[in-house]
Amino acid sequence: MRRVFADTSYWIALVNPRDQIHAKAVSVTQQISPVRILTSEMVLAEVLNSFSDGGPLRHAVGGMVQKLTSNRDVVIVPQTSEQFESALRRYEQAADKSWSLTDCASFQVMEAEKIQAALTHDQHFAQAGFETLLC
């Protein structure tokens, strides 16, 4: 089964029907199925934080993340101290880039798992040499 990494922009687009890439996220998901999706606790924290100011989507995103934890086709990579420190080193080394700490951690997960494609609209993934499925 093909494996892809899912970034923040993908999950936000799926849960928010008004998101500019919602239709594309839904369409690409259907096109690449069956697929095993890897994501990370850091990514999901970003997703939850993006809806923290309230409204109906806050409840929806909380429910989505809960469902992901029991979905056999989704692997959520836990945040470890070692991963955080390694991502921080990469973040510091990439001072010429506008990569976030979560981006750096995501790149490391993708490299460790030998995943080349990301469900993302974030050009930083292409800049780091990965295929972006939502661009």
Briefly describe each language-model feature range.
Residues 12, 48-52, 72-73, 91, ...:
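Short amphipathic alpha-helical interaction patches enriched in hydrophobic/aromatic residues
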